[in-house]
């Protein structure tokens, strides 16, 4: 639940890279505000807010640290002269990006299912969208095809897209005194993952510096953050966010939850390899250094990339897991956290959807409500994120609407949360359309109007451009 906040996410007036002015402390002040996540909007004191979705338990508040302020400039994914590949594996016969085969059941019971092709993450792949080259088996990330990372040969041209034209538009927009921010917004916001990748490479070849470094130099505050994150593409953007989550004072727990939980085995493999190439560090070790005790063990499970991905349902095992979850939580004194984590982290998406339907029918309380009552702190928020993703529509659309609404509800705007939730969701355009439609149903207000009510100027135009790109 969000507590009282002052100037959440307000960017400092000074240039990035300088010390904050005396007395300035980004992020929350005096603890977070008391705003129930996903509660009826009228309870959140929002002007003209329409009725909200059915009540459920709140997400947790972020720790008191620097989270919410625009990030300091950092060398990272997509930056100029990136770190050389470190430990990059040789191309596998089955294609780079396939996660290593590992025995099932390292955490929790062994899988009762035969090995199947990996399930699609983040709502499944979108059909008929994307300008990936013909004749290549697409690599999927956030439900969309993405360019294969090194050591695969990069795509240099795309049919129907002139990357040189867009690179020249950005060069002219950033040339001389002043910056044509609107041209940059109009150029970047319509691009899909393949187009963004080709543009970034073309820009660096023709201009002599990375697109990321140009955006950091020419822009500032939340507009800079938005367009830098957008320019990195789905995978690069998540790598950037993970570094943001673990860099500096404190840990941005909500970023770890949203980027690492509920992912396919291939997505986890891609994240770990891309993080190593970009920052020359092991992602597992970095995350372990930010967490402790059972929460660390939970994220070790997620980062192992050994989730069952069978499309087949074992209904007997579903009922068995429902009873295991109950006996590990409300059915005993104390809570067996690892038993619950083992099921929610390692079971397939279809299996968890079946559990989310069967649990309230058997025990008269939803899975997410049980988690909220049995857990606390970061582990509660992480497991609640997983549970809400398989409840309701079962595809996380309702959950993601609630998260977007939470970033804008109450006093002040949680800018960084709003930005990365919009950017990450927009890549899968059919799913993003479902989110926009569901947001209208839940809150009787369009997502665009909600964002317009929280932002101004070119920052507003950038986010509206992302929302309306299709």
Curated annotation (Swiss-Prot):
* Ranges for the Annexin repeats: 161-232, 233-304, 316-388, 395-468
Q: Name one GO molecular function term.
A: calcium ion binding
Compositional bias ranges of the Low complexity kind: 15-34, 93-110, 128-138
- Phenotype of the disrupted gene, per the record: Increases titan cell formation (low penetrance). Low or no sensitivity to high temperature or tacrolimus (calcineurin inhibitor); sensitivity may be background dependent. No cell population growth phenotype in a variety of conditions including high pH, low calcium, in presence of the antifungals amphotericin B or fluconazole, heavy metals (nickel or zinc), osmotic stress (NaCl), cell wall integrity stressors (Calcofluor White, caffeine, or Congo Red), oxidative stress (H2O2), or nitro-oxidative stress (NaNO2 or H2O2), or following ultraviolet light radiation. Normal mating.
Pfam families recorded for this chain? Answer: Annexin (PF00191)
Q: Which UniProt keywords apply?
A: Annexin, Calcium, Calcium/phospholipid-binding, Repeat
**Highest taxon of source:** Eukaryota
The segment annotated Disordered runs over 1-143
Q: List where Pro residues composition bias occurs.
A: 82-92
Q: GO CC terms on record? A: cytoplasm; nucleus; plasma membrane; vesicle membrane
InterPro entries per the UniProt record, alphabetical: Annexin (IPR001464), Annexin_repeat (IPR018502), Annexin_repeat_CS (IPR018252), Annexin_sf (IPR037104)
Its function?
Does not appear to play a major role in virulence. May play a role in titan cell formation.
Q: Which PANTHER family match?
A: ANNEXIN, ANNEXIN B11
**Family membership noted in the UniProt record:** Belongs to the annexin family.
Reproduce the free-text note on domains from the UniProt record.
A pair of annexin repeats may form one binding site for calcium and phospholipid.
For this entry, the protein name equals Annexin C1
Q: Which organism is it from?
A: Cryptococcus neoformans var. grubii serotype A (strain H99 / ATCC 208821 / CBS 10515 / FGSC 9487) (Filobasidiella neoformans var. grubii)
